Amino acid sequence: MPNLKSIRDRIQSVKNTKKITEAMRLVAAARVRRAQEQVIATRPFADRLAQVLYGLQTRLRFEDVDLPLLKKREVKSVGLLVISGDRGLCGGYNTNVIRRAENRAKELKKEGLDYTFVIVGRKAEQYFRRREQPIDASYTGLEQIPTAEEANKIADELLSLFLSEKVDRIELVYTRFVSLVSSRPVIQTLLPLDTQGLEAADDEIFRLTTRGGQFEVERQTVTTQARPLPRDMIFEQDPVQILDSLLPLYLSNQLLRALQESAASELAARMTAMSNASDNAGELIKSLSLSYNKARQAAITQELLEVVGGAEALT
């Protein structure tokens, strides 16, 4: 019977594990919903900010505007902002974005450019520190749902790097949220800022829904049609000063959106990983139950044979 006991113990262990993975899946799903609500809540501000920036840019298009955040310099050094997670159990989320950042660093090195990392997330920080890569700053322990305060703190560090000319360009490496089962590490330039194209900026809002007992994502593309400011609008301050003050806010807003996308990607990856783990646990329980029943039947048959054999020996 020890074989039966070991199988029974293993079945119970797998059942307990399945309870944990199922709970983690539901928690991740709830947090994806919160991330979705945050994206929707911050969108009106982002829309209005883009419209004001476009209006100011249109008003100043014939003037010689020299703003540090818009000035493109000869690139000798690049800052790489990498957004990863603090925890594992989320499939290939962390591995994919770290590999993308590492490959980009190798490309810059081949081009003869210096680089330094600004890291968000414990996983990327541990990876690059073990490999003794240059890290200017790191941020760990951020909220599961990113906040504007966190985005502002990171943006201040990036502004310091760029304005001090320690780096001539800052690139963002993050994971773009596509669906619950798909995400894509992408790279975009954060600094110097480029406000071109704000007159028709396409954006997407994702909504977590259920269908047939399964979670799925609905995506809606929204177009922001920015309009020039009224010609008779009078500014108390110089429009150049207003634009200069709004550009850091625009940077923080771009960064917040990247943090939101990365958080949604991580949560979706964790939800998918835990769902797969729960399914695999269910299949393993079925297989172990079948093995247990076969072993139990074999044990009963053996006992019957022993009883019959003993009875025959007595006759």
From Swiss-Prot:
Gene3D superfamilies, per database record: 3.40.1380.10, ATP synthase, gamma subunit, helix hairpin domain (1.10.287.80)
Record bears the keyword Transport: yes
Location of the protein in the cell: Cellular thylakoid membrane
Molecular function GO labels: ATP binding; proton-transporting ATP synthase activity, rotational mechanism
CC annotations in GO: plasma membrane-derived thylakoid membrane; proton-transporting ATP synthase complex
Keywords: ATP synthesis, CF(1), Hydrogen ion transport, Ion transport, Membrane, Thylakoid, Transport
Organism domain of life: Bacteria
Membrane topology, from the record: Peripheral membrane protein
Listed transmembrane segments: none
Membrane as UniProt keyword: yes
Pfam family, one: ATP-synt
InterPro entries according to UniProt: ATP_synth_F1_ATPase_gsu, ATP_synth_F1_gsu, ATP_synth_F1_gsu_CS
Family annotation (NCBIfam families): ATPsyn_F1gamma, PRK05621.1-2
Stated role: Produces ATP from ADP in the presence of a proton gradient across the membrane. The gamma chain is believed to be important in regulating ATPase activity and the flow of protons through the CF(0) complex.
Record note on quaternary structure: F-type ATPases have 2 components, CF(1) - the catalytic core - and CF(0) - the membrane proton channel. CF(1) has five subunits: alpha(3), beta(3), gamma(1), delta(1), epsilon(1). CF(0) has three main subunits: a, b and c.
PANTHER family: ATP SYNTHASE GAMMA CHAIN, ATP SYNTHASE GAMMA CHAIN, CHLOROPLASTIC
Protein's recorded name: ATP synthase gamma chain
Organism the protein comes from: Trichormus variabilis (strain ATCC 29413 / PCC 7937)
